[in-house]
Regions:
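N-terminal interaction/assembly modules
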Residues: 1-87, 134
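Short amphipathic alpha helix immediately N-terminal
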Residues: 88-103
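Short alpha-helical "recognition helix" segments of helix-turn-helix
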Residues: 109-114
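DNA major-groove recognition helices of helix-turn-helix
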Residues: 121-132
Length: 134
């Protein structure tokens, strides 16, 4: 059975992985814009001496970012699997967690309300019980 600290660690690592993925996606989009400014096709771009070198450099950076993004997304899937294990271990306490995860699709909502800081598992479980009674 997972301890409270282990749950906290996994949820924090998911949040960090998500932030990294967003950063990498932003960098990839910036690179795309740098490679091909909007409205201009690459064949229409003026050929300057370093054109091929520049494109090769951008392609290399793009590929590296793509690989980093894949690794981060793999990490997210691993942590989601652990979140599902938590649900199996403590289904009543995890009910709100699961609902928030499905409907908001925001991991921040899970982390802030449930495990990072202030609220204990007991408060969380108590809220779940109250919600089931309604």
């Amino acid at each position: 059975m997972m301890t409270y600290e282990e749950k906290v660690r996994f949820l924090k690592s998911y949040r960090i992985a998500k932030e990294n993925a967003e950063t990498y996606l932003r960098q990839i989009n910036d690179l795309r814009e740098t490679m091909l400014p909007s409205g201009i096709h690459y064949t229409d771009m003026p050929k300057h001496p370093n054109y091929e070198d520049q494109m090769a450099k951008y392609a290399g950076e793009f590929w590296e970012l793509q690989k980093k993004l894949e690794r981060v997304q793999k990490k997210q899937l691993q942590v989601i699997a652990v979140i599902n294990q938590i649900a199996e271990i403590d289904p009543l306490g995890h009910r709100i967690l699961t609902e928030r995860f499905i409907y908001n699709t925001k991991v921040e909502a899970i982390c802030k309300t449930c495990y990072i800081g202030r609220k204990t598992e007991w408060v969380h479980r108590k809220k779940a019980i109250e919600r089931l009674k309604i």
